[in-house]
Amino acid sequence: MARYTGAVCRLCRREGLKLFLKGDRCYTDKCAFTRRGYAPGVHGQSRKKISNYGLQLREKQKAKRIYGVLEKQFRIYYKRAERIKGISGENLLKLLELRLDNVAYKLGYGSSRKEARQLVTHGHFLVNGKKVDIPSYTLKVNEVVSVSEKSRGTEKFKTFAENPKTLPAWIEANYDNFEAKIVAEPNREDIDTPIKETLIVELYSK
């Protein structure tokens, strides 16, 4: 699958907020958005008034960039969200949050979702004891994510385990055993991603 290979800092500047696409660098003075918090391009410093459609489109682009999902896959997620009982926008965010690469990132295995995605692709993780190297794999309640025995001995994963993150209520982790369990589906209040999902629903409802 094709991936965006350009300067990711431009994406943050385009959206007008930090998307934390470069991990630890985003928290330092080296962050391009900290130094130039306006849109890229010649007219970047003079932001024009955006139409309702433009706001809806920007919100969709923001969600795609945060979770590292391309257009075709994002549209599939939305169609799945519509078929699930409940509010479509919240269902969409739940599906994105339950991606294996996102859960790996939430657990602290990677300073960014991009790094976590690479770790998944390289086969470092198991789901219910079986290797899963598909970043988009949707985790289900009661499934257990663990680090492979081989990877546990590496300095990278030892460092990750020694610096655990504060986890949302729907994930329980045992860093001593390099394991985590999905104990519930994420509620909207558990999702701290700066996305206005109602705008995305409005866009796809046209």
UniProtKB/Swiss-Prot annotation:
One of its GO terms (molecular function) is rRNA binding. SUPFAM superfamilies: Alpha-L RNA-binding motif. It holds the Pfam family S4. Disulfide bonds: none annotated. Signal peptide: none annotated. It comes from the Bacteria. Residues 98-164 form the S4 RNA-binding domain. Keywords: Ribonucleoprotein, Ribosomal protein, RNA-binding, rRNA-binding. The keyword rRNA-binding applies. GO terms for cellular component: small ribosomal subunit. The keyword Ribosomal protein applies. One of its GO terms (biological process) is ribosomal small subunit biogenesis. NCBIfam families: PRK05327.1, rpsD_bact. One of the primary rRNA binding proteins, it binds directly to 16S rRNA where it nucleates assembly of the body of the 30S subunit. With S5 and S12 plays an important role in translational accuracy. Part of the 30S ribosomal subunit. Contacts protein S5. The interaction surface between S4 and S5 is involved in control of translational fidelity. Belongs to the universal ribosomal protein uS4 family. This is Small ribosomal subunit protein uS4A. It comes from Clostridium acetobutylicum (strain ATCC 824 / DSM 792 / JCM 1419 / IAM 19013 / LMG 5710 / NBRC 13948 / NRRL B-527 / VKM B-1787 / 2291 / W). The lineage of its organism: Bacteria, Bacillati, Bacillota, Clostridia, Eubacteriales. The gene is rspD1.
